């Protein structure tokens, strides 16, 4: 049986509040994390992702207290990232109530963090996060770090392979070209990624309409679609989205 596709709201957290930027800048505050998480659970979200956007850029501590408060009220899986540098950081977040931990920039600097995290907590708890941007001159999707501000020499597809080989049980991949545009997911990127690895891939960046989700699931083998602003501002209602997907033949939990 095909695994049901997942709809995953993302909550970017700054100073304990939910915010959403366009292309990682121009932040706009949209609410309380616990209330937002409860509302998403009630609406039928399959999982939630939290990113502490202050952690990587300004060396802040991770969002332990937010995770603890949310996990007491919400029972769908929580994936948390931002500023995670050690397996001790991972352990503290898991103890606070996170089900999965995602690591982005630090995995590029220290790939053993993925290996060690998977050994200690299991692959199911470790998510490799990638910010990817098309590089026309090189003909590759290039990996960026530090909140999408610094290019690396890495090819995103090859890096995805390595993350999985090191023990990541899932990938969370953001298209920087599409992020914040509301013009649809980067079908080419996710088609390549979903074919390249044998773990679930969560697509992030570009959702602007219900049809964008339909296109993603119909044109790629992607497992989950992440979005933020279209959900935060009520532009797309999750129950309506799921009904449309189901009507279009997408395997989804209603």
UniProtKB/Swiss-Prot annotation:
One of its GO terms (molecular function) is lyase activity. Pathway: Amino-acid biosynthesis; L-histidine biosynthesis; L-histidine from 5-phospho-alpha-D-ribose 1-diphosphate: step 5/9. It holds the Pfam family His_biosynth. It is found in: Cytoplasm. Signal peptide: none annotated. InterPro entries: Aldolase_TIM, His_biosynth, HisF, IGPS_HisA/HisF, RibuloseP-bd_barrel. It comes from the Bacteria. IGPS catalyzes the conversion of PRFAR and glutamine to IGP, AICAR and glutamate. The HisF subunit catalyzes the cyclization activity that produces IGP and AICAR from PRFAR using the ammonia provided by the HisH subunit. This is Imidazole glycerol phosphate synthase subunit HisF.
């Amino acid at each position: 049986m095909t695994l049901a596709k997942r709809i995953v709201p993302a909550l970017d957290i700054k100073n304990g509040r939910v915010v959403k930027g366009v292309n990682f800048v121009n932040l706009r505050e949209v609410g309380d994390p616990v209330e937002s998480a409860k509302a998403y659970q009630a609406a039928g979200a399959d999982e939630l992702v939290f990113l502490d956007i202050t952690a990587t850029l300004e060396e802040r501590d991770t969002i332990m207290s937010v995770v603890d408060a949310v996990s007491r009220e919400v029972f769908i899986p929580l994936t948390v990232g931002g500023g995670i540098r050690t397996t001790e950081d991972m352990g503290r977040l898991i103890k606070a109530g996170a089900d999965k931990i995602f690591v982005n920039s630090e995995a590029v600097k220290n790939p053993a963090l993925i290996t060690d995290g998977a050994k200690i907590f299991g692959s199911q708890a470790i998510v490799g996060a990638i910010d990817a941007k098309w590089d026309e001159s090189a003909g590759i999707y290039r990996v960026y770090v530090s909140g999408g501000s610094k290019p690396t020499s890495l090819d995103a597809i090859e890096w995805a392979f390595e993350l999985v080989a090191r023990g990541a049980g899932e990938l969370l991949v953001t298209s920087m070209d599409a992020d914040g545009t509301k013009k649809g997911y980067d079908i080419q990127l996710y088609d390549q990624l979903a074919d390249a690895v044998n773990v679930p891939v969560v697509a992030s960046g570009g959702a602007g309409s219900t049809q964008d989700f339909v296109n993603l699931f119909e044109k790629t083998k992607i497992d989950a679609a992440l979005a933020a602003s279209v959900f935060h501002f009520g532009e797309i209602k999750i129950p309506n989205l799921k009904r449309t997907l189901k009507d279009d033949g997408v395997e989804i939990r209603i």
